[in-house]
A protein has these predicted regions:
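Acidic beta-strand-to-loop metal/phosphate-binding motif
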Residues: 71-72
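A short, conserved, highly charged catalytic patch centered on acidic carboxylates
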Residues: 1-68, 79-191
Length: 191
C-alpha cells in the first residue's frame, strides 16, 4: 500500500481493499471518481505468478468494468489491458512484465513501466497509448507486414541492389525468392 501511496500517487480514498468480485475479495481495487481503474492481485514475494493468477485478476477486473489489472509479488510486476468480450472470458493483453531489482537493478525501462501504474498515467492517456503502441507492433502484425506483397517486392529490389553495390554482380531476385527465404527464417504458420 505504501508503494501505491508514496510512489504511484494514490490517496487512501483511491484504494479499496474491501471490494469483492465473483464472490471473492479483490486484494486492491484502485478507483478514480468512483470507477475502478485497476485491480491488483498480490502474491507473496516467494511465489511465482502463474497464468491462473493473471486470469483470476482479469476476471475480477472485467466484472468491475476495469480496463487494467496488475499481478505482482512485489518483485515482479505485470500490467495487463483487459478487453471485454461479450459472452466469453475477457481478452488479456500484456503491457509489461518487469522484475524490480533483478540483474539490471532498477533500470530505466522498469521506471518507465512503473510510471504506467501511476494515477496520472492511468487517468490520462499514457497507459492507454503504451498499450496501443505495443499492440500495433505485436509479433502478428510485424509478421503480417513483412509478408505483405508490397514489402516483399521492395525487399527483393533492395536486396538485389545492395548485393550489386557490394559485390558488383547483378542478381535477379523475385518476390517468391524472398518469400521462400522468409519461410526459412520464420515458421510458415507465422507468416
Amino acid at each position: 500500500m505504501d508503494v501505491l501511496r508514496n510512489v504511484l500517487g494514490y490517496d487512501d480514498a483511491d484504494l479499496d481493499t474491501e471490494m469483492t468480485a465473483l464472490g471473492q475479495r479483490i486484494d486492491i481495487a484502485v478507483k478514480h471518481n468512483g470507477k475502478v481503474l485497476l485491480v491488483i492481485e498480490l502474491k507473496n514475494v516467494r511465489h511465482k505468478l502463474p497464468t491462473a493468477v493473471r486470469e483470476q485478476a482479469a476476471n475480477y477486473a472485467a466484472s468491475k468494468s476495469a480496463d487494467w489489472t496488475v499481478v505482482t509479488n512485489g518483485q515482479v510486476w505485470k500490467l495487463y489491458r483487459i478487453i471485454p468480450v461479450k459472452g466469453h472470458d475477457p481478452q488479456i493483453v500484456e503491457v509489461f512484465d518487469i522484475a524490480l531489482f533483478d540483474d539490471d537493478g532498477l533500470s530505466d525501462n522498469d521506471i518507465a513501466c512503473f510510471y504506467l501504474l501511476t494515477k496520472r498515467a492511468l487517468t490520462g492517456s499514457d497507459s492507454e497509448r503504451r498499450f496501443h503502441l505495443k499492440e500495433s507492433l505485436n509479433d502478428r502484425r510485424i509478421l503480417a507486414a513483412i509478408n505483405d506483397e508490397k514489402i516483399v517486392k521492395a525487399m527483393s529490389k533492395l536486396l538485389a541492389t545492395t548485393y550489386r553495390q557490394e559485390n558488383k554482380v547483378n542478381v535477379k531476385l523475385s518476390s517468391e525468392d524472398v518469400r521462400a527465404r522468409l519461410e526459412d527464417l520464420f515458421r510458415p504458420e507465422d507468416l
